[in-house]
Curated annotation (Swiss-Prot):
Its EC number is 6.3.5.2. It comes from Ruegeria pomeroyi (strain ATCC 700808 / DSM 15171 / DSS-3) (Silicibacter pomeroyi). Catalyzes the synthesis of GMP from XMP. The lineage of its organism: Bacteria, Pseudomonadati, Pseudomonadota, Alphaproteobacteria, Rhodobacterales. The gene is guaA. The active site is at C86 (nucleophile), H176, E178. This is GMP synthase [glutamine-hydrolyzing].
Amino acid sequence: MSQTSHDRLLIIDFGSQVTQLIARRLRELNVYCEIHPYQNVTMDFVREMAPRAVIFSGGPDSVTREGSPRAPQEIFDYGVPILGICYGQQTMMTQLGGRVESGHGTAEFGRAYVTPKGTLDILDGWFTDGREQVWMSHGDHVAEIAPGFEVYGTSPGAPFAITADTSRHFYAVQFHPEVHHTPNGAKLYENFVRLAGFKGDWTMGAYREEMIRTIREQVGDKKVICGLSGGVDSSVAAILIHEAIGDQLTCVFVDHGLLRKNEATEVVGMFRDNYNIQLIHADESDLFLGELDGQSDPETKRKIIGKLFIDVFQKHADTIEGAEFLAQGTLYPDVIESVSFSGGPSVTIKSHHNVGGLPEKMGLKLVEPLRELFKDEVRALGRELGLPQSFIGRHPFPGPGLAIRCPGEITREKLEILREADAIYIDQIRKHGLYDEIWQAFVAILPVRTVGVMGDGRTYDYACALRAVTSVDGMTADYYPFTHEFLGETATRIINEVKGINRCTYDITSKPPGTIEWE
């Protein structure tokens, strides 16, 4: 639980896949909130957190099932506004004396329209056209509202789509206001936090000052090591920590030989020259590429890179005397996902490359100044710290680097070809003003050679795939709809300017079923 001095809002998570979107909508309103799984929320926890308001999330379970998730019964006597969403509405009704039934032709999945029934303060700004589009996802439905509640909105499948007990400031909706498919959902959240009395003072300027104080109190006069990747998260974390403790921070930048064109030079230059941060540049490309020689299985490549990264980082970190802390760019979604809702195992899609085992292995304590932030908030904090937009807005880049954009065996020749092709592709995207519209774009060099003709000669070179996707959070993604003219112009440049490629393709696979990266 955060020690922030700001007003808090507690989101009790009943397992919805979009619970994080609730938190994001609230953060956009400058309201500090935390997500906690229902099984961890006791009244002692609630009293310690002292939230100004509570939201019950949706969830996949049925409140009609014996033993299904519930909120602490006493929370309804705690005296703060409560908003129940989908399953959250249903458990609120059940726990307060209403009744929920399963199915029977009233299930709703997808777009629906709610019509008003009376006026309600939380619906200020709604129903300007007589009805409101919302996103439904429910099999069960409220059959009888709890005592004290009244109906304020209905839909064909949910006669109690919006209900409220205004005397206790309890509100309950059957739909999901947090998703984009409920176009006016943000207004509902805005009304709720206003009625709850939030000041809207959760800003990155305030967070910066608060976190600097926290880092100084935590670290004292001890030294901190930070693994710098050159990405936005680790860079913002490093600059914030450096602002707090100055030369007590040393960054270790491990160059595994799998970076993009000129990336190592740019990262080292920015942090040494612009920010005067003590930096160890560990060029270990020969070691990494040597260990990867002959390896083609993607999981094997990831594991080799992950293990070597930890070994190399530790070797260089051991040269820093008196270091007691390790800084990491952990974000709030990482924190949420580490506390599993169900506690059950999940299928490993891909191994994640990080330094998760380092603190215990090195006997270091963690400094995680971004652990309360979402990605968009990290970028806002970066702007607050003076990082240029060209850096803050960079597309995500995987820890294993170009290794997972080079299916099959990795060679220095293929990496050089890939760097050049990727640089041209990104240059094309920037020239056409498309970079900020795209979540991630890159080139993958394919493990196949094709026959081509250049001039009067025959070529037998590699094919490459261009990849560009749009996404909100990387969990799902759609391919970017480039024009044929753009793709033709880009393919021509790559084939003409990069020796070793004679064919370009464009990957139009969405996620799911594909992943964003090729490996």
